[in-house]
Design a protein with these regions (language model features):
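An internal, D/E-rich "acidic patch" concept
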Residues: 58-115
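N-terminal signal-anchor/signal peptide hydrophobic helix marking the start
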Residues: 6-16
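Pore- or pathway-lining transmembrane helices of multi-pass membrane proteins that form conduits
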Residues: 130-154
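Hydrophobic alpha-helical segments of integral membrane proteins
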Residues: 9, 51, 61-77, 88, ...
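Hydrophobic alpha-helical transmembrane segments of membrane transport/permease proteins
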Residues: 15-66, 156-191
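Alpha-helical transmembrane segments of integral membrane proteins
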Residues: 2-3, 96-129, 145, 173-336
């Protein structure tokens, strides 16, 4: 294991601790009695007193944070008092795979579309293809996701499902929590196709801004690489235009794109809240929104903490991938 990977792994606990501290402070910053916020203002006094004792709200703040960290280390994110005291971790375990599934689908669309537009813009710089591609990219950044979602529903609602993860008549085996994977493993082709049709529209809507960002970064990186000496050498040696672009240029232009992936994943996790609301997607976005409406502060805190840790974990993977793509980083070169 290289020193670079070791350094990244050493900082991971510090980052996760900082995330937990921020979530704790935000939860304690809620005005009023936290026990009443959890159990509800109309809850009996005995219930609120019991919550104060169980959750340590009657103790000093440093002690409360110590108890909070102790529960986190045991995997205890709290309970949903308005849903029969069900564990928040159990609820999140049902919702998180759906959001990750939507996020990965949107990232696949953004990466494929962004690379295509960026490469075409760089190869045909100054032409109509370049102008059209960058216009699409600019529109993708400018249009609000919720408004675009409503337009998609109006335009394609007669052809594609506009709500939910799967048709109510299908019941796939719950093996992984990911609807696409579970329907595929079931061997029912019609059910899998229905799952694909359900994820298609929200994934397209959610991917618009990351697609535009990928296209612009790819174009800028490709233009820089295409003007380098080794590209001119490859062309002079008779390499085909497609090989020059896809093998020589794209490989060396990939570093900024890989760096962008981690940031895009974070945006997609945040953007999923709006997208899931528009398309009634049963994921973390709708879970957080319903928790806000029901003043389930422990559910909100648990969801935010899990999403933040997911984002940190994905960025760690991207950093490690970056180190394998660029050996200078892996070996600690000062030129990196």
């Amino acid at each position: 294991m290289t020193p670079y990977i070791l350094r990244r792994l050493m900082f991971l606990p510090v980052v996760l601790w900082a995330v937990s501290l921020i979530v704790f402070v935000l939860m304690r910053a809620v005005p009023g009695d936290p026990a009443a916020a959890i159990a509800g203002e109309k809850a009996p006094r005995e219930v609120r007193d019991r919550i104060r004792r169980e959750r340590g709200f009657d103790r000093p703040i440093p002690v409360q944070y110590g108890l909070y960290m102790g529960r986190l280390l045991r995997g205890d994110l709290g309970e949903s008092f308005k849903h029969s005291n069900e564990k928040v971790s159990t609820q999140i375990a049902r919702k998180l795979p759906h959001t990750i599934e939507l996020t990965l689908a949107a990232m696949a669309v953004a990466l494929a579309g962004g690379l295509l537009l960026g490469i075409l813009s760089a190869v045909y710089k100054g032409g109509w293809i370049d102008a059209a591609s960058m216009t699409v990219a600019l529109a993708g950044v400018s249009v609000p996701v919720f408004w675009l979602g409503l337009l998609f529903i109006l335009a394609f609602g007669s052809m594609l499902p506009v709500s939910g993860n799967l048709d109510a008549n299908y019941f796939p085996p719950d093996r992984t929590g990911f609807v696409l994977i579970d329907t595929l493993l079931s061997g029912n082709g019609a059910m899998f196709l229905d799952a694909v049709r359900h994820v298609l529209m929200p994934a397209l809507v959610l991917s618009t801004i990351p697609l535009a960002m990928t296209a612009r970064i790819t174009r800028a990186s490709m233009l820089e690489v295409l003007g380098s000496d080794y590209i001119r050498t490859a062309r002079a040696k008779g390499a085909s235009p497609s090989r020059v672009v896809l093998v020589h240029a794209l490989r060396n232009a990939a570093l900024p794109i890989v760096t962008l992936l981690g940031l895009e994943f974070g945006y997609l996790l945040g953007g999923a809240v709006l997208t899931e609301t528009v398309f009634d997607w049963d994921g973390m976005g709708t879970y957080i929104l319903s928790s806000v409406r029901e003043t389930e502060y422990e559910s909100i805190g648990g969801a935010v903490l899990v999403l933040a840790c997911t984002f940190v974990g994905v960025n760690l993977v991207v950093d490690l991938l970056y180190s394998f793509i660029d050996p200078r980083i892996r070996h600690g070169s000062p030129q990196a």
